[in-house]
Amino acid sequence: SRGLGDVYKRQVVAYAKGSLGMEPIRSQGHIHKVSPFSQWSTPEVYEIWNGEAVIYMQESATDEPGRCYAVYAQPGDVVVVPPYWVHATISTNADESLVFGAWCDREYGFEYAEIRRHKGIAWYPVFEGDGLKWIRNTNYHFSELVRKAPREYHDLGIGKGKSIYKIFEDAPDTFLYVPNPSVKKEVWISFEP
């Protein structure tokens, strides 16, 4: 069995300011591969440190994308992506860089096949005026896009105003669900970002 120090991949990620034509700087949509440790696709925990972000997520990469969310996050906000969900990280302000922490299982990898078959995520952003406009990808069946702020994840041991690093320092077992999502199976069943 692996210890907590072995299972987390802690990343500091920085996106340059700017855009790619009308599109914001963003990651390619992906799903985390099933971990050989847990036999689950693993969640990801984001904490925004600089800039403005949207963590886009959808339940599935099949023709029926399920629920689709654009979670708008500011510095200090935490956003959790559940196991098996498609997700992408988007910088929403072309005038500043986006810097964030991202935690996932160290054995993670990405699944792209179904997303590529659909030519991307179910909704993709473009800059329009001072904000983002979301365009539906017609390679998926229609699913409404819910735009929202991050919630407090009390069911996962995360509240507002305390960094995930401080939470980990004080109580590392809080994040056992990152390498072993089954310990929070009941949360993932009806997950709301």
Regions found by a protein language model. Give the residues of each.
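Short, small-residue-biased leader/transition segments that mark boundaries at the very start
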Residues: 3-8
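Conserved short histidine dyad/triad with adjacent acidic residue
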Residues: 12-41
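Short, conserved beta-strand element in jelly-roll/cupin
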Residues: 15, 39-60
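Short, structured patches in soluble enzyme cores that scaffold and shape functional sites
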Residues: 49, 57-59, 83, 91, ...
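Short, structured beta-strand/loop micro-motifs enriched in basic residues and often containing a Trp
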Residues: 58-68
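Double-stranded beta-helix
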Residues: 63, 92-193
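Conserved metal-binding segment of the jelly-roll/cupin
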Residues: 72-93
